[in-house]
Amino acid sequence: MEQLKAFDNEVNAFLDNMFGPRDSRVRGWFLLDSYLPTFILTITYLLSIWLGNKYMKNRPALSLRGILTLYNLAITLLSAYMLVELILSSWEGGYNLQCQNLDSAGEGDVRVAKVLWWYYFSKLVEFLDTIFFVLRKKTNQITFLHVYHHASMFNIWWCVLNWIPCGQSFFGPTLNSFIHILMYSYYGLSVFPSMHKYLWWKKYLTQAQLVQFVLTITHTLSAVVKPCGFPFGCLIFQSSYMMTLVILFLNFYIQTYRKKPVKKELQEKEVKNGFPKAHLIVANGMTDKKAQ
């Protein structure tokens, strides 16, 4: 126990030396004073994916329809609360859309910080997205993009809450909360097979996410062009991180929605040229059993 405490002190001292003094307004808030809980929860998340897949390997997939319905509804409602509260609190604080520093809005800044804590905490709750994929044996959904996005967001927002918990930080979560209302509504509806025919708009969610990232980068860099006292290093780091998401999500979009029609056309031509469907190879390397 003493060794763990010593390690915790060393990690926190290292972070304080790297980023400077923490924002005193968030001292004592749940999970924020020490990085260790966030780090341990992230490692637990990654181990759960690996061990969960091994555990489920020879077991039937679980349905979880009822749990998923409640979960998606809860995340949708939380996202709606954060969206409304961020709009109201930033309006109350008289936030400047181009650049907003950390300490000019008084109680408005504290109100924004409280909502952003819920945003940070929601990233922990969203680890369940992956756990549900594991239990339902949807391993094709557990991509590098999925895991990287979930794990990194939780850790980055721990840093944001400790050093830049308001001001310019409000914009990305405002957009993301709106996107998550759409996303988790979609996920909730997709649990029911009878609703699948109405869910043709999935690819537009990815497009909306890409637009969200570009707008967030633009908003972040606007504070570089016309500074207002918000930490310059944080602006550059946030822009760089968002660029990694743009690259990964754009690659996902191209692989999922741009290359599939080409493959489909090729398969149709092969059938027309006299090749039976049983000889076609599908994406996972298995033959189309329905055609055999």
From Swiss-Prot:
Keywords: Endoplasmic reticulum, Fatty acid biosynthesis, Fatty acid metabolism, Lipid biosynthesis, Lipid metabolism, Membrane, Transferase, Transmembrane, Transmembrane helix. The chain crosses the membrane at residues 29-49, 67-87, 115-135, 153-173, 175-195, 205-225, 230-250. It is a multi-pass membrane protein. It is an enzyme of class 2 (transferase). Its main location: endoplasmic reticulum. The keyword Membrane applies. It is found in: Endoplasmic reticulum membrane. Signal peptide: none annotated. GO terms for biological process: alpha-linolenic acid metabolic process; fatty acid biosynthetic process; fatty acid derivative biosynthetic process; fatty acid elongation, polyunsaturated fatty acid; fatty acid elongation, saturated fatty acid; linoleic acid metabolic process; long-chain fatty acid biosynthetic process; unsaturated fatty acid biosynthetic process. GO terms for molecular function: acyltransferase activity, transferring groups other than amino-acyl groups; fatty acid elongase activity. Catalyzes the first and rate-limiting reaction of the four reactions that constitute the long-chain fatty acids elongation cycle. This endoplasmic reticulum-bound enzymatic process allows the addition of 2 carbons to the chain of long- and very long-chain fatty acids (VLCFAs) per cycle. Condensing enzyme that catalyzes the synthesis of polyunsaturated very long chain fatty acid (C20- and C22-PUFA), acting specifically toward polyunsaturated acyl-CoA with the higher activity toward C20:4(n-6) acyl-CoA. Interacts with TECR. Belongs to the ELO family. ELOVL2 subfamily. PANTHER family: ELONGATION OF VERY LONG CHAIN FATTY ACIDS PROTEIN 2, FATTY ACID ACYL TRANSFERASE-RELATED. HAMAP family: VLCF_elongase_2. This is Very long chain fatty acid elongase 2. It comes from Mus musculus.
